[in-house]
Amino acid sequence: MPGLKRILTVTILALWLPHPGNAQQQCTNGFDLDRQSGQCLDIDECRTIPEACRGDMMCVNQNGGYLCIPRTNPVYRGPYSNPYSTSYSGPYPAAAPPVPASNYPTISRPLVCRFGYQMDEGNQCVDVDECATDSHQCNPTQICINTEGGYTCSCTDGYWLLEGQCLDIDECRYGYCQQLCANVPGSYSCTCNPGFTLNDDGRSCQDVNECETENPCVQTCVNTYGSFICRCDPGYELEEDGIHCSDMDECSFSEFLCQHECVNQPGSYFCSCPPGYVLLDDNRSCQDINECEHRNHTCTSLQTCYNLQGGFKCIDPISCEEPYLLIGENRCMCPAEHTSCRDQPFTILYRDMDVVSGRSVPADIFQMQATTRYPGAYYIFQIKSGNEGREFYMRQTGPISATLVMTRPIKGPRDIQLDLEMITVNTVINFRGSSVIRLRIYVSQYPF
């Protein structure tokens, strides 16, 4: 049978296909060199390789290799003639019998190299670079990588092999970047959010300390993770842009911040007092300066210095009107023997007092009392003059006393003179007389 003879011839030649290097001392894959006989003997892979064929496949040894065929495949068992065997029954040609080494001392003619190799000028089998000779079958999307005796088809970085095609790997799906990821064909790029900078590893992000690099704040910069905040010095407030600071007008917050006047200044404020006052240690309250005590007044030697809240008064000596006579430093008396004194108050006593502007009301401001109580006498207290605005009234607090009450707040500066009359009535001796306290009230300009 010519077909089987050709197969046998190829099988015999396979025993002597030269391996790269020395062809006389090595055998091709699938054969072992018998050191005693110097022959290449076939390896039965079906016995030496565990589970050479799996599943429903069975292993069939052949010269230089083995086959895996389905167990249900029909097996050919026809006649086969072998020049080295008188009888053979099997699905494949039997292995060639050992050939005596003495019959093949050397190989003196060019031989056929294994697949993936070619004979060079020195009759050596060298690797064929299929990638360089463009004799590979890699897909255009793949790259060819030459190997010893063959080649492999692979994909470049950023691609993976799927059904013979190199498809782009979406690295962004796997969290390669710490913050922002942008996929590109065959690769990816990482970026960072505002306030961060990309590290040298190209993946992680580092916070940018804006306060050190650019310091965008007008006053104080505080670095935060991924950003920064601006703070203002005391007395300033942050504007809507979050960067600039503007002066805070503390005086507009409350009218009670200072007792008198609040003066705003950049980043702060201070309280001031009007003339005649000094600022206390609390830096907000004003205290009257007693010009009379400190002799810081302009009164003459004949005048009396009377201190007021925020100022002073120079009071002239009392001058009694006719027919009154001066009987003391501040008292005038009308003589009883004088006929015009019968319908006049017996005495006029001068008194001075001061009140602050806008004092809260009602307020008891002055007390009047009889110095002597006579048997059978009673006393009547009234405001004889000066109360045209009905800002005061007399409230009798006892048989011989009464209190002057301020009923309306009075705004200063203003000077008021009231004649407070005490009428004495004695029914026992049928007597009626009166005395007057001439009260001069000085209302200051300020409510303190």
From Swiss-Prot:
A molecular-function term among this protein's GO annotations: protein homodimerization activity
Chain residue ranges for the region called Interaction with LOXL1: 245-448
UniProt superkingdom: Eukaryota
Family: Belongs to the fibulin family.
Main location (coarse class): secreted
Gene3D superfamilies for this protein: Laminin
A GO-annotated cellular component: extracellular region
Organism ancestry: Eukaryota, Metazoa, Chordata, Craniata, Vertebrata
Motif (Cell attachment site): 54-56
Assembly: Homodimer. Monomer, homodimerizes in presence of Ca(2+). Interacts with ELN. Interacts (via N-terminus) with the integrins ITGAV/ITGB3, ITGAV/ITGB5 and ITGA9/ITGB1. Interacts with FBN1 (via N-terminal domain). Forms a ternary complex with ELN and FBN1. Interacts with EFEMP2 with moderate affinity. Interacts with LOXL1.
Modifications after synthesis and translation: N-glycosylated.
Domain named EGF-like: residues: 42-82, 127-167, 168-206, 207-246, 247-287, 288-333
UniProt keyword list: Calcium, Cell adhesion, Disulfide bond, EGF-like domain, Extracellular matrix, Glycoprotein, Repeat, Secreted, Signal
InterPro entries with a match to the protein in the record: cEGF, ECM_structural_protein, EGF-like_Ca-bd_dom, EGF-like_dom, EGF-type_Asp/Asn_hydroxyl_site, EGF_Ca-bd_CS, Fibulin_C, Growth_fac_rcpt_cys_sf
Protein name as catalogued: Fibulin-5
CDD domains (UniProt xref): EGF_CA
